[in-house]
Amino acid sequence: MADAAVGKEKCGDQRLVSLPLSRIRVIMKSSPEVSSINQEALVLTAKATELFVQYLATCSYRHGSGKAKKALTYSDLASTAEDSETLQFLADILPKKILASKYLKMLKEKREEEEDNEDDGSDLGEALA
């Protein structure tokens, strides 16, 4: 009976968590270190995830440009992840968007720079020989 009440308040059908527990369980089981998942741990992980998402959204909304429009955008989330020391670990997951043409130009410049470095290294090797 106690397991049936997990994830729901005792005095009603209002759930303690909004995220689907089955999805959280699948994500947790995808880790090779996890062999079994306790129901209480599952509910606590789901609640912690909700609180984290709420914190990220609140910080992004407060510091983002979407406040004037009363909207939260991807760029607000990416900026918050990059600027906040606490959320810095998300910078790789939430990169700032750039145009494909800019990205291709950056790749080309990087490739040319690497080729120049290789050419400089081969000249040095020939001079020593």
UniProtKB/Swiss-Prot annotation:
InterPro entries cross-referenced by the UniProt entry: CBFA_NFYB_domain, Histone-fold, Transcr_DNA_Rep_Reg
Comp. bias (Acidic residues): 112-123
GO cellular component, one term: pericentric heterochromatin
Tissue/organ expression: Ubiquitously expressed.
Record keywords, A-Z: Acetylation, Coiled coil, DNA-binding, DNA-directed DNA polymerase, Nucleotidyltransferase, Nucleus, Phosphoprotein, Transferase
Disulphide-bonded residues: none
Modified residue annotations for N-acetylalanine: 2
Positions bearing Phosphoserine: 122
Domain of life: Eukaryota
Molecular-function annotations in GO: DNA binding; DNA-directed DNA polymerase activity; protein heterodimerization activity
Coiled coil stretches, renumbered: 104-120
Pfam (any one): CBFD_NFYB_HMF
Role this protein plays: Forms a complex with DNA polymerase epsilon subunit POLE3 and binds naked DNA, which is then incorporated into chromatin, aided by the nucleosome remodeling activity of ISWI/SNF2H and ACF1. Does not enhance nucleosome sliding activity of the ACF-5 ISWI chromatin remodeling complex.
PANTHER family for this protein: CHROMATIN ACCESSIBILITY COMPLEX PROTEIN 1 (PTHR10252:SF54), HISTONE-LIKE TRANSCRIPTION FACTOR CCAAT-RELATED (PTHR10252)
Subunit description: Heterodimer with POLE3; binds to DNA. Component of the CHRAC ISWI chromatin remodeling complex at least composed of SMARCA5/SNF2H, BAZ1A/ACF1, CHRAC1 and POLE3; the complex preferentially binds DNA through the CHRAC1-POLE3 heterodimer and possesses ATP-dependent nucleosome-remodeling activity. Within the complex, the heterodimer with POLE3 interacts with SMARCA5/SNF2H; the interaction is direct and enhances nucleosome sliding activity by the SMARCA5/SNF2H and BAZ1A/ACF1 interaction. Within the complex, the heterodimer with POLE3 interacts with BAZ1A/ACF1; the interactions are direct.
Protein name (database record): Chromatin accessibility complex protein 1
Native organism: Mus musculus (Mouse)
